[in-house]
Structures are given as C-alpha cells and as structure tokens.
Amino acid sequence: VTLEYYADKKREYKSEPACYLGTVGSNANQIDWRVIEHPTGTARYRMAGINTKVDGKDMLVFIGGSTNPYNYNGVGYNGTASEPDSKVWVFSPGEKRWLTAADTTPVMDLRSLIEIDGEVYSVGGMTSGQQVSGKLIKHPIKLQ
C-alpha cells in the first residue's frame, strides 16, 4: 500500500501490485532484492505467506488478503467494506515463476501462516462480512 497526497483533498491509500525476491548471501545483514513479475497485477492487502513443500518442492505460498486496503474494522480507507480473497498464489523459487493453485477459504487480516504435519493453516484473521475469527483454518494447496 502506498499513500497519495493531494493539495485539495484527503490523502488516499493506494494498492501497489509489486513483488520482490530477496537473496541472502554470505552476509546475513544484506539482502539483494529484485523485482519479479506480479502474478495478477492486482495487489492484496494483509495476506500472509509461508515457505512450504508443495508436491515435494520448496514453494512460497501466499493466501488471502483483500483487494481493498482497510482499517482495523475491515472497512476500507475509502469507506467501502472489504471482503477476503480466496486466491492462493504459489511462487517456485527454483523455477522463478508463479504457479496456479486452487482457491481456498477466503480470509483476510492475516499476520502469518503456520505449517502442521505438512498442511498450511491460517490462525485468526477476518472472514466474510468483516467477522473477526479465532479459528485455525486449513488451506489445502493444490496446484492446477
């Protein structure tokens, strides 16, 4: 999310569809960041990611979020209620490309994902209708 400032009206929060891949070398305090292609061109706000194995290969998996940046109550900075996204984005570091995966349970306002016995879960967040959830939600990762 970026901020746009105007002389004649209130600032606006704008989505920024951007992806970066960082490589850590021998100095762990330095990361070489590179821009990589965005999988859709539409940014997601407060999604979460995890490094996990998918079909036996290391993958970066991103789940949930919303296309409308929002405040703590799930209402967008633009005054419109935000809804969670069901898309799953999978990036293959080995192939340096995005892969298509099946949708999952829509959830937003995530801080992280966890892995238990090879399965990916979100903890809490918000579900449809800006409902705060304390549930553990399993997200099967199925490449298409």
Indicate residue ranges for each PLM-predicted region:
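Kelch-like beta-propeller repeat domains
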Residues: V1-Q144
